[in-house]
């Protein structure tokens, strides 16, 4: 019934494309009129559009004319005319949707249409790419078109001076990576001066390779961190423990005897679990090594951090391997992106995992970090007023885009029909048989002059295959994280006749593989050769173009680009991206995946079923299964993994939404402090609130005198705020004083101290000082709060055993932590402002200038330097040094008072976090 309805009225995608084609007809009707304009008249259209928009015309009203102008500018600047399908994609992007366009269909050029249209509004457009190379390339390449039309472009990259970044964000169009946009948002919310902030309000973003950024990287939060406590020696000593423990042959099953061994590894969840025997052996080994006191348990609150160190050491030794998840380069452990195969320089695993891997590899162990600020890409990109994206493979993730980001996916038809042949998978029993078949396929293609792109899932596999090709004397290029610098060059040559290229995953996205080889790359090299005259350059360029034509015809005759996959990835989308390198713009091509029962995906998810089929068929050695049923079985396994990963990302978002709501509130308050001309009313309200709470702790409202603890109140005022107020004497002299009268006397004393300090140093200098103290208190307590949330999150799943909803419990306790943090910020600010000793206005100004000149964070791993006291002569007791977050706790009984001083029992306070 559903399929019949679709035939009658068309799918949602068909109906959208039908609407968009009506607009394309309007744009095409304007082409001849626009072509008649001079260059100056065409450029002047930008100001005309801006004026009309300011006078009330919507961007939708301007769309046909604006798109026609961009198409004409593209013809004049690049000699390239936007196809009608690119117009369809541009309309989809403007409408805040994801445009799925096949590889080679011109996504970069298509993006110029909505970018130009939305830049007319003057609020800034962000174009988000997956790496710095593409950001710079696209900013320079497409910037020529925007400059021709009178618009400015900027690019943001790591390590860029702050003034350049501010200028780049002020441009009409800003290019950059997802990481840099996210980090700049966090940096802006750590600044101490308004003029140092970089980003404007987040208006519109187009995300290139949207699936890579919004899905593959959604589980990885952006974190700015500073150094925490040094546990270097502990990581080294703990690394010696895993080899002394025995791995179980299989995971324990309910109602069955536990297999021999100390721990088992769950490859699906990427976790390691200790058995009962494993706990006992681990405690014995740690005691022998002097790490754990004799007779004590790893689950004692004092030693809970040791348990954490042991588990990360086990994970580092059993789940993380060199040349798969990471490489060792220049004495450092560098993460390899599992989706692109690129090195992720500057990224580090959290929770001590990176340090554990460094200990395993015997390289220098970097300090642990304390989170100063963090955000996930999911929450960062949802802050834009309008978001859209483009990719070659979004349809498999359309549900997630709709569910998480409220982004609809529109599949844009190709300009020319797709004629690539996707063959069924071939499944072998062993990896050796699989590699023999791959070698035979590569050799056959090489002899026929057909270029081959071989996709692998790890650096280790790419180098294994490279070794086999060397033995077979087959010339080839390897493109993995270790050859990252030559990426564009290798990909540009991958389409030459008989060329063999091995690439990890989808390294090289963003550069098309042109059949016959890339002419543009060779032309660029000739133009860059200063030893040649202009005439010689033109002659050589002419020869290159002439030589390319027969090479292109030869490759097409041989069948186009051949894609060989050596393993299936967890995600069908990554496999489709590999296939998508062939068959661009109507070119011929073919693809096939070669698999074995020893491949990780097959072993974990589909091995038993396929092995059963092979055994029933009694296939001889070296003979594969090749059937649609097997391919479908593998895709079912991939769907299971995708579903599990989607659940993980959705759960991450549900938990992060709690922190995100708190982040929004705190950053909004911080921005108010930063932007307000005077924060004196806010500070006075804080002082009044803190004083009221202090009085009510000792003298409850509407209470009788017998319930009052006046000496304790006097002591608290003197100890906390250095206010010496003899309330006992007042009560002796004025016996009729009520609790409200005492509160008023305390408030008068607090106001007197506060205004006295302002009078001493002057309004302007004091305003600078109290702003600085307020910002410092917010930053200090926010980073402590992030650590507390992290601890809470790690153990919250255990609430399920008590028949409680972990998410609801997390929300409730996170709110309590947040409320407590706001109270501590208030108390700290009031204490510093009331107890600080000042001597002169000049010293205040000098200290404020010193604070403003503090170095600002400039890297992925930040050390947010502690600011010096803003006033000379500040009493040492007025602001105690910030202590690092520590994992170790004193030994406390469950029913003892919590050592944090809250007055609660330990089990009801920090015992819950432990």
Curated annotation (Swiss-Prot):
The keyword Cytoplasm applies. SUPFAM superfamilies: Helical scaffold and wing domains of SecA, P-loop containing nucleoside triphosphate hydrolases, Pre-protein crosslinking domain of SecA. It comes from Bordetella petrii (strain ATCC BAA-461 / DSM 12804 / CCUG 43448). NCBIfam families: PRK12904.1, secA. One of its GO terms (molecular function) is metal ion binding. It catalyses: ATP + H2O + cellular proteinSide 1 = ADP + phosphate + cellular proteinSide 2. It holds the Pfam family SecA_PP_bind. SMART domains: SecA_DEAD, SecA_PP_bind. GO terms for biological process: intracellular protein transmembrane transport; protein import; protein targeting; protein transport by the Sec complex. It is found in: Cell inner membrane; Cytoplasm. This is Protein translocase subunit SecA. May bind 1 zinc ion per subunit. ATP binds at residues 86, 104-108, 512. Belongs to the SecA family. Part of the Sec protein translocase complex. Interacts with the SecYEG preprotein conducting channel. Has a central role in coupling the hydrolysis of ATP to the transfer of proteins into and across the cell membrane, serving both as a receptor for the preprotein-SecB complex and as an ATP-driven molecular motor driving the stepwise translocation of polypeptide chains across the membrane. The keyword Nucleotide-binding applies. It comes from the Bacteria. Zn(2+) binds at residues 898, 900, 909-910. It is a peripheral membrane protein. It is an enzyme of class 7 (translocase). Monomer and homodimer. Part of the essential Sec protein translocation apparatus which comprises SecA, SecYEG and auxiliary proteins SecDF-YajC and YidC. InterPro entries: Helicase_ATP-bd, Helicase_C-like, P-loop_NTPase, SEC_C_motif, SecA, SecA_CS, SecA_DEAD, SecA_motor_DEAD.
